[in-house]
Every structure is written in C-alpha cells, then in structure tokens.
C-alpha cells in the first residue's frame, strides 16, 4: 500500500507570500509566532513577511534563536516562546533549520507527553496534529515545508535525530522565489545539491512507486536545467523559480517513500562537526551512487542520466550507470562543492564512530543496497 501526505494548501510563484495573510485570516487565527533565524532578520528577508502581517493587521512575535543544525535547546526555547506569546499559529520562515524547529515546537505543544525531544526520534506515535504552521522556505533544497520529517541535533550525544510524523506537516506551504534571491552562491549550490540528493535517493529507494518516480524524475530535470544558472546569477528569476519548484517536487516524493545512506552518512557530519546538511549530502552523493549501482536500483540509473540531460538512446545499463554518476559529479564540481571529506574538517580518527552512527540512522533502511558498518566506514574512507 502506498501513501501520499501533502500540505492542505500550497502557493507557488514570485510574490505569492501575500497569500499568507488571507490564509491566516480565513482560518480564524489571531496571532502568529514567526519562527526564523537571525541572518534572515539581518538581511531583511524576515521584514518581507513582517510587512505582509502588518498590512493585514495580524499581530505577531518573533523567535529567532535557531542554529543551522537546530538543537534540542532551540526547540525547547522556542516552545517556551510560543507559549509565552499567546500565538495560535506559526509562520516558519527559512531553510530546514527554521521549519524543522517550528515542526518540533508544534508537535510538542500539542502532544506534551513528548516534551523530551529525544522521544520523538524515529516514527513518533503522536496523537494530535501540530500547531498550525505556514511554512515559507528561503532556500531551494530541504523541502521541509512539504515533508513529514524533521531533524533535531542532540548536542550532548553528538547525534542528529530524524523524526517522522505525518502530524507535523505544515498546513500551508508558500514557495516564493523572491525570498530566495539573496541566497549566496555557496548556499544556493549546497541546498540545490541537497534537493538533487532527495530526488535521486527517493527515485532508487525500494519504496519508490509510479507517483514518486514522476515527482523525482521531474525534480532531477529541473535541477539539471536551473541549478548552475541560479548559482552563477542569483537574480535570475527563471533559475530561482525552477529550483524552488524542483526542491518542492522532490519533497513531495521523498517525504512519502524515504531516503538512503547519503542522508544516513550526512547526519553524523552535522552532529559531529556542525557541517551544513546540504554540503554533506552534496559531497557524499556521487560516492554513494557508485556504491548503490550494485543493487536492484541499477537499471534506474538510465533514468537519472536522462533526467540529467544525457542522451541515453541505445545506452546499456552499465553505460547509464557511468553517465548518471558522471553527470552528478560534473554538476557538483561546476558549482564548487567540496569533493573530499578532508576538505570540510572531518577527522580520519572519527570515521568508525561516524559509520556506527550512520548505520543506526533511520534513513539506512531505505537504501536500495543492504549495508553494514564496515561498508559505510569504507565509503567514508573513499570520500575522505
């Protein structure tokens, strides 16, 4: 049996952020907690949402104590801020960090028996839907606005906790590329490759099916068409819109069928070194694609190659595998993604511990090739 869980309502297009006010008012909400991060306040992005709320006479308060890899403390402080604010809904503005934090706040507020954030790891058995949240992404990568997942860092145990819960999905997603225009080149590149990782991992996961394949093939195509241009010229509206659409479509798929060991291996890098999630995924993706080519998913690499712009007419499966991996690696290099773990501060002596953490990650079960701690450690060494 297959299942698709999506937002009740979604808006897409330049300037569509104005729809937030109508959605809040027609649902009868009285006050908003705007969950965002300090850089978005500093660079004036949050002000664009504040303007929408002010123009509609919707009162709000702001919570912005959020790290790039949000922590248990960020969640609990945000929960306290929500309770103190008297708000009855949230607007989550940002990348996965802000939106994931808002999801966790909303779940715990309405399911107080899960105040220990660690108890939410894995498939959380919550009973109540989260506080109604309107998610507004400012990066084209995580697709947190449409997924049933969120990731919180347990700093004490150096662990990223993947939480899966259909009750956390935002009731409304607003994908406005105008809010993504200020992303610097490096963030555009890493979040874009994060979206590509979502698309490829969920395209080849054993849980993939006709509808998810449709989403992911199109997402890969759009990323191939638009990521390089979005990195080169952040003001290219067509490229920004293409990437905004791609990451959302990728999220529609992976949220419902799962991911694989690119994510399993990326999560410990964030927990150990605070490595940005997109950078970790982008670096690891080609290496894991090589590993997963020896699996039943091998035949689908032809589809990946085709979506990446390769003329696959007459290609054998083996040729398709090589072409897909090369196309992904070439795109990664073209947007200046680091190619080795040693370049991003990973320590050789940590590789075994990283492998143990990755093997125990919830995403490992979605990998098309069965794996082991030893296999993952070997992959880390190859990528080092």
What are these regions (language model features)?
Residues 1-63:
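An N-terminal, well-structured beta->alpha segment
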Residues 41-114, 229-240:
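N-terminal small/polar loop signature for handling phosphorylated ligands or for N-terminal nucleophile
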Residues 51, 149-257, 374:
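Carboxylate- and glycine-rich phosphate/diphosphate-binding segment that chelates Mg2+/Mn2+
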Residues 73-178:
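Glycine/threonine-rich beta-strand-loop-alpha-helix active-site module
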Residues 141, 248-281, 361-365:
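Glycine-rich phosphate/pyrophosphate-binding beta-alpha loops
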Residues 272-350:
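Gly/Pro-rich interdomain helix-loop hinge
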Residues 347-384:
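Short, amphipathic C-terminal "tail helix"
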């Amino acid at each position: 049996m297959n299942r698709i869980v999506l937002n009740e309502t979604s808006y897409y297009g330049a300037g569509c952020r104005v729809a937030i006010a109508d959605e809040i008012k027609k649902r009868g909400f009285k006050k908003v907690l705007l969950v965002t991060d300090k850089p978005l306040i500093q660079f004036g992005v949050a002000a664009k949402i504040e303007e929408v709320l002010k123009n509609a006479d919707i009162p709000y308060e702001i919570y912005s104590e959020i790290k790039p890899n949000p922590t248990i403390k960020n969640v609990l402080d945000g929960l306290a801020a929500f309770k103190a604010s008297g708000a009855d809904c949230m607007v989550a503005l940002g990348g996965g960090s802000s939106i994931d934090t808002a999801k966790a706040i909303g779940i715990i507020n309405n399911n107080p028996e899960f105040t220990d954030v660690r108890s939410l790891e894995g498939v959380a058995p919550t009973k109540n839907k989260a506080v109604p949240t309107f998610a507004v992404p400012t990066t084209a990568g995580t697709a947190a606005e449409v997924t049933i997942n969120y990731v919180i860092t347990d700093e004490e145990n150096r662990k990223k906790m993947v939480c899966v819960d259909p009750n956390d999905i935002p009731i409304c997603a607003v994908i406005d590329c105008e809010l993504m225009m200020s992303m610097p080149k490096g963030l555009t590149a890493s979040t874009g490759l994060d979206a590509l990782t979502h698309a490829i991992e969920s395209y080849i996961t054993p849980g993939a099916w006709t509808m998810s394949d449709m989403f992911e093939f199109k997402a890969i195509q759009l990323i191939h068409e638009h990521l390089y241009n979005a990195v080169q010229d952040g003001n290219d509206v067509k490229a920004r819109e293409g990437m905004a659409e791609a990451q959302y479509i990728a999220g529609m798929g992976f949220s419902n069928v799962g991911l694989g060991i690119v994510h399993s291996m990326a999560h410990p890098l964030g927990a150990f070194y605070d490595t940005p999630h997109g950078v970790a995924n982008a670096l690891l993706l080609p290496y894991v694609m090589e590993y997963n080519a020896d699996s039943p998913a091998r035949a689908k690499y032809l589809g990946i190659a085709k979506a990446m712009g390769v003329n696959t007419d007459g290609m054998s499966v083996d040729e398709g595998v090589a072409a897909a991996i090369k196309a992904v690696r070439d795109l990664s290099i073209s947007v200046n993604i680091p190619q080795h773990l040693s370049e991003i501060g990973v320590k050789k002596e940590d590789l075994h511990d990283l492998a143990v953490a990755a093997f125990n990650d919830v995403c490992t079960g979605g990998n098309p090739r069965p794996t082991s701690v030893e296999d993952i450690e070997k992959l880390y060494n190859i990528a080092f």
